[in-house]
């Protein structure tokens, strides 16, 4: 089976998810091609040349990012072309379940048929930084969970996708978030005292909207996707994110380093988790059940008192 995986990524979590999926499809004796959606990457593979299409994106305010919705709009028509969706966010809140409804409608009109959709949790790149133990837990779960998806799709399994009306309305109303980057573009700039002019932010911007002005300032245009790539990865923390400055997360993600840290057991979400992250427990319990169903080892070791299965008692 020939699989095409098209995705947009801001700070790399969706790219990582896409790469894991591609690797697992190949393990299952399929061909897998990756295509990253960004301005200037115009060599778009034709979906009609593939047996199965994957579409992936980071959830922005319970929605598909505008740049990815624009990509979907430009796709050629097809005839009953099967596709799946994988999406990434930092929290398991129910309105995320309807984040794809907008592109689902577009794809249906073009002749594409949705057969599976999966929501993966990865660390926030905005609002606040997740603790290392939770970052490790999310990273370690991503690999086996994408393996399950690749196995299921290779076997020809399909899910019945239903979008909750209330969640869909929430998603529609919050699509106003598409306006936020355009407004915030007026205020985003570099802090000249901290900026070393390394040009990392300009060169790596997925929308190619960051640029250097005649006065030497780094500014952006209304094409900005507010993906947070520039602020997350700036080595000197020199990006001022305008209106969203109080919510920035810096320092990047270092998953491979965390994975090797034996002092970090990666079980931040467990039976005894309290506060905000208590809301994450049912998500991980459900993922454990899914992994067991497909005979895949749970990637972290919970002690008996903290295992999520205690929620059932």
Q: Which ranges hold each PLM region?
A:
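FMN-binding flavodoxin-like domain, especially the glycine-rich phosphate-binding loop
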Residues: 3, 13-16, 24-36, 47-57, ...
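Nucleotide-activated donor-dependent transferases that construct or modify glycoconjugates
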Residues: 4-8
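Short gly/ser/thr-rich secondary-structure transition/capping motifs
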Residues: 33-40, 215
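A mid-sequence, solvent-exposed acidic-amphipathic segment
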Residues: 168-198, 202-206
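Iron-sulfur cluster-binding cysteine motifs and their immediate structural context
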Residues: 190, 200-219, 229-247
